[in-house]
Swiss-Prot record:
F-type ATPases have 2 components, F(1) - the catalytic core - and F(0) - the membrane proton channel. F(1) has five subunits: alpha(3), beta(3), gamma(1), delta(1), epsilon(1). F(0) has four main subunits: a(1), b(1), b'(1) and c(10-14). The alpha and beta chains form an alternating ring which encloses part of the gamma chain. F(1) is attached to F(0) by a central stalk formed by the gamma and epsilon chains, while a peripheral stalk is formed by the delta, b and b' chains. This is ATP synthase subunit b'. The chain crosses the membrane at residues 13-33. It is found in: Cellular chromatophore membrane. The lineage of its organism: Bacteria, Pseudomonadati, Pseudomonadota, Alphaproteobacteria, Rhodospirillales. CDD domains: ATP-synt_Fo_b. The keyword Transmembrane helix applies. HAMAP family: ATP_synth_b_bprime. Keywords: ATP synthesis, CF(0), Hydrogen ion transport, Ion transport, Membrane, Transmembrane, Transmembrane helix, Transport. It is a single-pass membrane protein. The gene is atpF2. Belongs to the ATPase B chain family. It comes from Rhodospirillum rubrum. PANTHER family: ATP SYNTHASE SUBUNIT B, ATP SYNTHASE SUBUNIT B', CHLOROPLASTIC. GO terms for biological process: pyruvate decarboxylation to acetyl-CoA. The keyword Ion transport applies.
Amino acid sequence: MPQFDPSSFPSQIVWLVIALVAMYFVMSRLAIPRLAEVLEQRQRLINDDLKQAEALKAETEAAIAAYETALAEARARAHDEIRAVTEAAAKAAEARNAEVAKALNTRIKDGEARIVQARDEALTHVREVAGAVASDIVGKLAGLRVDDAALTAAVAAAIKE
């Protein structure tokens, strides 16, 4: 093998140095700057993405805060409207109950008046019937004829007891 022949070592070392120097210049002038440029570009993109993410995060937090504020205001308005509607409904129900109670009281008073009137009519008829029955009983049992004024007074006294 010629690579292991010691007489060819100096020429191999020269070519090794030439190849390494050529590779060094190619790498230092072409490959490494391109790699450095790619790495810098990648780092710039990462930094830009991070800045954009921070800006979007801040914007999102502001939007969330605005949303929560709007939601709290909407809840407060809804509670106020519900309370107002509830109060209005309670007032309307109270007014309706008052109207119904007034109508019922009027009907009750009318009914009581009719009952009193019917009772008074019944009592007057009872007095007349009681007077007629008492007159007939006294006439049939005792065979006497009783004065109508005395008979009416006796029936009135008996009804009062």
